[in-house]
């Protein structure tokens, strides 16, 4: 296993074991960087904190909730409106967020009275909202504010409201992934089993680890409904607070993002006997395999086959149009956690791209254990990289595009490497058959953007650029080396879907399947 030592990190020798280049024929154990350890002092990590992920990733997608952070306003601002967790209630949870705005005097004298005042004010400001989540931050955790007691006090005085308390201060784990565990366990301990749902079908699931980034959840739920499956709750995208309290009545937990939500799945299995089925909504083959899994589980294979046949016939020619033009282009897959193993292999197989690097900021060893076997020889894998290591990797690998978040992505743009936002998306949804074509389209648009012809011009020089055959369009750039048969194909086509695919899903009417059980 050739560990890779970055030049910029030679002064921090411990960093060497956090990056590896996968060699030929290496076993799984040989090709894993160390992961999910405390950040090494001096490495200037880009990780977030446990508070951030509890509120920002898992809590915020709940659509009918007032989200209030007990701490300084900076904590709240950093977790507000940075991901597109849309909902079908006019995106209430994205428009508003609350902070108790703790100051120095509250650190000295305590901030429990301030918290209670803010809770009551928030409910009065939005009388139609009766549910709230309170998030603990480091400073109020360190001074010992009892937010559980305050929540109980308010619920006694206002019996029509319900409050969930998330004790996940920023220091509650080596990275933001500590917050995944904290909020998972807190929710099942405090709220699951406190509401009894209406069961309307024979096949009932919880869709776990899906947060409806630009409509991903709604696309997947559409497939479930077309198969006659009742989605009791989604943890936590585009779902109501009370819906999540009824998770204990599902027949199956369908798990998407294992990194953020496997903990509640495991607890639901232990406490309520609900089995877990891991699925993947990214890519034609992984999605088709996932549909087969729960089709077989519920004995409704005929329904899933009809959906797969219809969707593949509709969208496969468009995916292949992009595959022909992306073939051999190099990509660095630099998301946060589980997307590195959701995407690495299927991007190569279905889009023709070559994955040259994967990294994770907060992933565990399990993420690398799943991801590295899906990568080819020579792939650079990095755990918890900093900005300088990222720039050095770009210089060494020279990818045509990176799939990452906004912070490393904007840095990459400065060195003329395009990126797609792997966290909040550019033009999602990216799940589903159509979504995967949208993803390929966005990758294509980024790589072949005509702007790159201008970005390389040195504007300090007086000489006009030599355009040769003139300014080239995106398709002129992508089609130059294609055969005439591919270029003029009558079966392949660019993406023909609309700008807003989610509205169509929301308007769909679903078949009524006869129930076998009363």
UniProtKB/Swiss-Prot annotation:
It comes from the Bacteria. It catalyses: N2 + 8 reduced [2Fe-2S]-[ferredoxin] + 16 ATP + 16 H2O = H2 + 8 oxidized [2Fe-2S]-[ferredoxin] + 2 NH4(+) + 16 ADP + 16 phosphate + 6 H(+). Binds 1 [8Fe-7S] cluster per heterodimer. [8Fe-9S-C-homocitryl] cluster binds at residues 257, 423. The keyword Nucleotide-binding applies. InterPro entries: Nase/OxRdtase_comp1 (IPR000510), Nase_asu (IPR005974), Nase_comp1_asu (IPR010143), Nase_comp1_CS (IPR000318), Nase_Fe-Fe_asu (IPR011290). Its EC number is 1.18.6.1. One of its GO terms (molecular function) is iron-sulfur cluster binding. Keywords: ATP-binding, Iron, Iron-sulfur, Metal-binding, Nitrogen fixation, Nucleotide-binding, Oxidoreductase. [8Fe-7S] cluster binds at residues 49, 75. It is an enzyme of class 1 (oxidoreductase). Hexamer of two alpha, two beta, and two delta chains. The structure of the 8Fe-9S-C-homocitryl cluster is assumed to be analogous to the 7Fe-Mo-9S-C-homocitryl cluster. This is Nitrogenase iron-iron protein alpha chain. The gene is anfD.
